[in-house]
Each structure stands twice: as structure tokens, then as C-alpha cells.
């Protein structure tokens, strides 16, 4: 029986049907499944500016497949545009708003399934959280990646522009060059083009079976992207008929598959936060330690930006996520029996994918010839992060540094010091009170990390924070430090000049201060007053969980 029968069947539902007739239903439509289209279209960001065409294609395809589509809007924010500002505090919050809005619309209207369309970073995990909560047949359509910008024959991404700021500050380029990069970095619609957060999460969603094979690496402007939206609609209608639900797919093994692919492609630190949140919502026992366990056995085999050479459209040409998955499957690093929204197993989906990467390309390598022998997202613990932290060590030859702490109470303070050349080789930069509660909202530190890299200090300076990093960040960066400063974490006790050790080889993040001294500082520490007492940020800071649990707000 259809869930939507609650609003379409029986004499008592005559007023409900009257409303539905006004939006296009007729006598023959009340026995059809009602499918929601959660449309994240927006012109505030290139990531989402092309989604309306995909929604229209999906709507037509749903009708052709015998369903009744109902389109509703959900929000997005632009991480790239809000980066480095107070507005960035709303980015992670938007993940919860997206999840809440999709859940609200679908459950209020008794929809039988949902096709969610998104582009910017939080669209993907937001949609997945709602799907796990509702457990109705669901599919995700990614808006697609942007094609690279070009300047002097070189590929550009949005990170190129952030790094140019640091290069200008250190005298490596002039202002004309910075403006040239600015004008060429973002050529049109699509999500940021490297293996940054949006492309990482779309890859994870494809791996877990919630979007169609190859669809997570398609370019936003290519015809195949619109065709995949139409095909996704047909697949979803079949899933409704066959009662294939999200919790059937969201198993521990599916999450392990997603982590393996994220390691293999060199994906974003944000994936740790988002997968923990989705797993918690789905009732799956996934912990931050699972990421470290899998990292030890899965190599990085894709040479992708931010630390590598290529962009996501290059990965697509080289075989996309299915090619990566096939290599992992053959190496025993993937669970082949996990189900997809199509009703097939992963092994069945990958049956016709070649067992070797394509020749004449070096985007995807053999397992035996990796970029890095182990995954690039290391989970560090120690007295500075007893619940754990996430280090992204791709692009770093020696992921070990002991140095003096340079302590900043906000991202703005930190960036000013970097651009004024006050951060030197060997320093350990600490940015605190930027966590889920303290920020609130865990701002991403792309501006400081890009400035450090732009000044040539990416190998020589460590940056640790209870906030987050953009998928575009690389270097010796450690985020998601938990417990965070605002709830009494040790990061809040660090003083200027303290010795800190970051050692990714030993999985250690340690404040080299005697326990007696730390106890004295802890006794003197006072919980800061909340930066926001009202509005969504005030509400968020009161509800949000630790980053080690995914920073969710709905489990009280």
C-alpha cells in the first residue's frame, strides 16, 4: 500500500484531493505514487545554478514512469562565497536545515519517495540525513562538477584563487596575476572541481548505492548529467514498487565501502564528519576509529586536486568511481554484496568494469602503484584530542612537526597574522573556539591554509583547530579536534609558545605540558558566554553534538 493513500483515499480525504486537483492531479492520478523532488536550485552559487534543468528532466521522467511528482525547494549556502567570513558559521548548520526541510516536506505530504537534487557541499549529507530519518525510497541526483578554469595552459579551481591571496602576500605574484586567476578560476555551473567536499560526498553516495553509477563525476554542463536525472527518476519509481528503502542500503559494510573509496580518491576531511552523522542517524555503529582502521589498508590511487594534479572531470574520463571501486573490489577492499537503489549488488554493478585502469592516463593508478600506500585521512589522538581529530596528510612528505604554539581565538586573527608574515616555519598554529558549539558551526579554515600554502609554508607549518577544513585544504592540517575548546577541551588550555607535537606516523597530537600545569589551567578556565543566544546559530549551539559524533542536532 502506498504511503500517500493517507491523503488520497476515502471519502474523508475529499478536501485533500481538492487541493491536489489544484496542483494538477486528476481522477487517474490518485492511485499513483507521489514522489517528492527536493530541488536545491539557487543562483547564489555556481554549484547549484544548473539544478532547475535537472529537476525539470526528473519531473518529466517521473510522470512517464507512472508517478506524480511534487517539487519543493530546499536551501543551500555557498561555502566558497561565505569562506573567511561570519557567514561561514551557517555552512554546517545548513546541513541540518536541508535535512529538516526535506523530512518536513516529505512526511507532511505523505510522499512515497524522494528524489533529491543538490550541488554544494552540505546538500549531499543533508539529503542523506533526511533519507535515513524518513526511510522511504530515495535517490540522489548530483548537480555535477564544474569544468576546470584555464590560465596559461594550467587548470584552475577555486582553491587556486585562495592560494593566490597567500602568493600575493608573500610577493610571489602581483595583483594583476591575482585578478587573472580570479577571473578564470570558475568558468560556469558546477561544484568545485577538485576532490573537494562536494565531489567527495557525491562519490560516497554513489558508492553506497544512492545514486547511479558514473553520475557522481559527470560535469554539470554535459548532456549526460541531465540524462542521468531522468534515469534516476525511473530507478526511483522501481524502488518504490519494490519497496527498496534507505536503511536496507545503509549497513556498516556500505559505510566501510564509502570510507575505502574516499581514501582511494584522496577525499575531504569533511567526509568523516558527514558519514559519522549519517551513520548515527541510520543507527549504524560507525566510529571515528573505523576511518583509521580502513586507512591502514586502503591506498590513495587517484592523483586529484587539491594536493594532486587532476580534477574530477579527468577522473570521469578515466573511468569514474566505478573504476576505482572495481580495483578496490578485486583487491578485497570493498564489500561486494552491499545493495544499491537499483536492487543490484555492488558486485553486479561492477561486473563489466575493467579490472585494470585505462591505458594512457595516470589519474587512476593500480593498487600496486599508489600515490600513497595508506589513506590520507589520519585519526590523531592524544591529550590535545582525547575524542580524536582528523589530519589530512596528502601532499606532505613528512607529516611530523613539533613546534611552538601560535594561538588564535578566531580564523580572522589567524589569517591576519599569516598575511602579515608573522607565522614562521616550524610554528604550530592553533585556531580555537571555532567548533560546533563554540563557533558556532565549525567554520572551514580554507583561507588560512591556502595562505600558508601560498607562502610556501605548507610543509613547514601545522595548523590545528576545533573547526573544520575545506575539501580544498591540504598540508599538515588537523581539524575536528574534540573535545572542542568551548566545552572545556584541552585545546582551550593551550598558551602561546607551548610545545605541540603533531605526528601522523604515530597518530599523535600532544600538548607537551605537564599534567600538573594542565590541571592548574583547567581550574582557572571559564566557559565562555555563547556568541549567539538567539536565532538559528543560538539554537544550533545548544543542540549540536561533538564533532566526534558527527555534529548532529536531532538526537537529544
Curated annotation (Swiss-Prot):
Active site per the UniProt annotation: 470
An example Gene Ontology molecular-function term: magnesium ion binding
Residues bearing N6-carboxylysine?
122
Cofactor: bound how, per the entry note?
Binds 1 [2Fe-2S] cluster per subunit. This cluster acts as a Lewis acid cofactor.
> Among its keywords, does the record have S-adenosyl-L-methionine?
no
Cofactor requirements of the protein = [2Fe-2S] cluster; Mg(2+)
Q: Which residues are noted in the entry as [2Fe-2S] cluster-binding? A: 47, 120, 192
UniProt keyword terms in alphabetical order: 2Fe-2S, Amino-acid biosynthesis, Branched-chain amino acid biosynthesis, Iron, Iron-sulfur, Lyase, Magnesium, Metal-binding
Enzyme class, first EC level, given as a word = lyase
Instruction: Report the pathway entry.
Output: Amino-acid biosynthesis; L-isoleucine biosynthesis; L-isoleucine from 2-oxobutanoate: step 3/4; Amino-acid biosynthesis; L-valine biosynthesis; L-valine from pyruvate: step 3/4
Which GO BP terms sit in this record?
isoleucine biosynthetic process; L-valine biosynthetic process
The EC number of this protein is 4.2.1.9
Protein function: Functions in the biosynthesis of branched-chain amino acids. Catalyzes the dehydration of (2R,3R)-2,3-dihydroxy-3-methylpentanoate (2,3-dihydroxy-3-methylvalerate) into 2-oxo-3-methylpentanoate (2-oxo-3-methylvalerate) and of (2R)-2,3-dihydroxy-3-methylbutanoate (2,3-dihydroxyisovalerate) into 2-oxo-3-methylbutanoate (2-oxoisovalerate), the penultimate precursor to L-isoleucine and L-valine, respectively.
Annotated family = Belongs to the IlvD/Edd family.
Matching entries from HAMAP family are given as: IlvD
Protein name, UniProt field: Dihydroxy-acid dehydratase
Gene giving rise to this polypeptide: ilvD
Amino acid at each position: 500500500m502506498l504511503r500517500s493513500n493517507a491523503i488520497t483515499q476515502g471519502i474523508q480525504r475529499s478536501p485533500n484531493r481538492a487541493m491536489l486537483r489544484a496542483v494538477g492531479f486528476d481522477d487517474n492520478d490518485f492511485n499513483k505514487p507521489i514522489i517528492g523532488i527536493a530541488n536545491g536550485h539557487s543562483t547564489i552559487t555556481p554549484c547549484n545554478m544548473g539544478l532547475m534543468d535537472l529537476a525539470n528532466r526528473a519531473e518529466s521522467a517521473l510522470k512517464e514512469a507512472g508517478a506524480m511528482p511534487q517539487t519543493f525547494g530546499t536551501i543551500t549556502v555557498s561555502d566558497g562565497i561565505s569562506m573567511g567570513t561570519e557567514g561561514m558559521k551557517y555552512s554546517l548548520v545548513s546541513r541540518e536545515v536541508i535535512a529538516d526541510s526535506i523530512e518536513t516536506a516529505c512526511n507532511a505530504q505523505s510522499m512515497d519517495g524522494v528524489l533529491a537534487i543538490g550541488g554544494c557541499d552540505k546538500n549531499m549529507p543533508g539529503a542523506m540525513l533526511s533519507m535515513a530519518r524518513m526511510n522511504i525510497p530515495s535517490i540522489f541526483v548530483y548537480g555535477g562538477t564544474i569544468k576546470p578554469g584555464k590560465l596559461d595552459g594550467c587548470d584552475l579551481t577555486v582553491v587556486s584563487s585562495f592560494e593566490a591571496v597567500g602568493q600575493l602576500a608573500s610577493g610571489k605574484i602581483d595583483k594583476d596575476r591575482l585578478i587573472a586567476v580570479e577571473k578564470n578560476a570558475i568558468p560556469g555551473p558546477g561544484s568545485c572541481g577538485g576532490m573537494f567536499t562536494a565531489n567527495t560526498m557525491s562519490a560516497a553516495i554513489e558508492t553506497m548505492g544512492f545514486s547511479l553509477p558514473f553520475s557522481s563525476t559527470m560535469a554539470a554542463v554535459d548532456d549526460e548529467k541531465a540524462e542521468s536525472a531522468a534515469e534516476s527518476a525511473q530507478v526511483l519509481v522501481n524502488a518504490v514498487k519494490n519497496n527498496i528503502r534507505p536503511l536496507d542500503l545503509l549497513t556498516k559494510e556500505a559505510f566501510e565501502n564509502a570510507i575505502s573509496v574516499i581514501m582511494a580518491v584522496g577525499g575531504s576531511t569533511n567526509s568523516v564528519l558527514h558519514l559519522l552523522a549519517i551513520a548515527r542517524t541510520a543507527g549504524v555503529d560507525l566510529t571515528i576509529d573505523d576511518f583509521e582502521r580502513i586507512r591502514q589498508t586502503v591506498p590513495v590511487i587517484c592523483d586529484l586536486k587539491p594536493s594532486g594534479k587532476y580534477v574530477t572531470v579527468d577522473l570521469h574520463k578515466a573511468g569514474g568511481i566505478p573504476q576505482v571501486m572495481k580495483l578496490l573490489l578485486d583487491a578485497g577492499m570493498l564489500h561486494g554484496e552491499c545493495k544499491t537503489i537499483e536492487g543490484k549488488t555492488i558486485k553486479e554493478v561492477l561486473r563489466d568494469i575493467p579490472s585494470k585502469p585505462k591505458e594512457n592516463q595516470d589519474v587512476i593508478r593500480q593498487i600496486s602503484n599508489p600515490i600513497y600506500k595508506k589513506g590520507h585521512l589520519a585519526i590523531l589522538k592524544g591529550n590535545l584530542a582525547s575524542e580524536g581529530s582528523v589530519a589530512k596528510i596528502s601532499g606532505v612528505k613528512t607529516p611530523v612537526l613539533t613546534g611552538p604554539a601560535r594561538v588564535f581565538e578566531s580564523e580572522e586573527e589567524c589569517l591576519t597574522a599569516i598575511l602579515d608574515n608573522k607565522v614562521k616555519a616550524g610554528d604550530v598554529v592553533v585556531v580555537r573556539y571555532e567548533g560546533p558549539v563554540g563557533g558556532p558551526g565549525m567554520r572551514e579554515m580554507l583561507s588560512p591554509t591556502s595562505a600558508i600554502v601560498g607562502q610556501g609554508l605548507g610543509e613547514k607549518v601545522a595548523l590545528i583547530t576545533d573547526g573544520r577544513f575545506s575539501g580544498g585544504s591540504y598540508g599538515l592540517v588537523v581539524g575536528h579536534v574534540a573535545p572542542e575548546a568551548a566545552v572545556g577541551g584541552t585545546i582551550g588550555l593551550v598558551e602561546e609558545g607551548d610545545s605541540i607535537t603533531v605526528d601522523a606516523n604515530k597518530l599523535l597530537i600532544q600538548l607537551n605540558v605537564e599534567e600538573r600545569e594542565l590541571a592548574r589551567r583547567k581550574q582557572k578556565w571559564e566557559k565562555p558566554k555563547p556568541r549567539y543566544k538567539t536565532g538559528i546559530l543560538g539554537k544550533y549551539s545548544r543542540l549540536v553534538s561533538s564533532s566526534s559524533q558527527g555534529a548532529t542536532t536531532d538526537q537529544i
